[in-house]
A protein has these predicted regions:
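Residue-level recognition of conserved beta-strand edge/terminus positions
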Residues: 60-62, 78
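Amphipathic alpha-helical interface segments
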Residues: 96, 101-145
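Short, mixed charged/polar active-site loops
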Residues: 83-85, 112
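Structural motif
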Residues: 53-57, 73
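Short, compositionally biased
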Residues: 49, 70-83, 91-93
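Short, positionally conserved secondary-structure boundary motifs
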Residues: 1-54, 63-67, 121, 131-145
Length: 145
């Protein structure tokens, strides 16, 4: 899987939009047969998506046709301004982006409130296939360059 270590997503807004050109990955990850349809892997930072630890690696598959987005699934969405990991719901000419962390402020408002992403502002969408988190190891991680 091409791994773009200089590209990250956060569970909020990330202004580090970088190139995920398949011809220029930072490294290659040998994931065996875990994610055979993966087209990219990037790091996730933040706490708005509780299923992904900050610093974990997301295995992704690029979605070329926005009409095939599955409501309620997790995606990495990249615009010219930011890259985020969110659950998506189709809402006409935009997607509603939801966090799975339902934490609230003292007044009851969500800290990670849903927001709208215009479809015509989206450069790339990737379906999250899975996540790899290293908690502890004294062994080497298999990475090919």
């Amino acid at each position: 899987i091409p791994f773009y270590d200089d590209v990250s997503t956060i569970g909020g807004l990330n202004d580090r939009v970088a190139n995920t050109d398949p011809n220029s990955p930072s490294e290659w990850i040998d994931a065996g047969d875990w994610f055979p349809e993966a087209t990219a892997a990037i790091r996730h930072y933040g706490d708005s998506m509780v299923e992904y630890s900050s610093g974990s690696i997301l295995a992704l598959r690029r979605v070329n046709d926005q009409r095939l987005i599955m409501n309620g699934r997790n995606y990495v969405i990249e615009t010219s301004e930011y890259r985020v990991t969110k659950q998506l719901q189709d809402d006409g000419d935009h997607f509603m982006a939801y966090s799975t962390n339902r934490e609230t402020y003292p007044d009851g408002r969500q800290i990670h409130a849903p927001f709208s992403i215009p479809k015509d502002a989206i450069r790339y969408i990737y379906l999250v296939l899975g996540c790899v988190t290293k908690e502890y190891s004294n062994g080497a991680i298999q990475i090919r360059k």
